[in-house]
Amino acid sequence: MTVSTTAVVVCGFDALLPERGVAALIGDRQIALFRTYDGQVFALSNTDPVSGANVMSRGIVGNRGDVPTVASPMFKQVYDLRTGVCLDDPSLVLTVYPVRVTDGQVIVGD
């Protein structure tokens, strides 16, 4: 599920390390930002749907075939970074936020 939010500059693109996640607070929402080796940036809910803990930014970034993924650090379910859908159990879904990079700045929201 993609959620619309007011556009907010979160950080500089260079502050995101490839294949690592970082947490950010936008209003009262915790989000997890991920930058992949090919330079794509993804924004998802930081809340693990299984445990309820705000830990997704500490997940293991990788891929399954051509699908960029993050594995929950709690129970290791693997989520598609593009859609938020769990590849192991499609009933589990992370909220996806619109994200873009403009002038070297990572902007979350519309």
Predicted regions and their residues:
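Zn-dependent metallo-beta-lactamase
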Residues: M1-I26
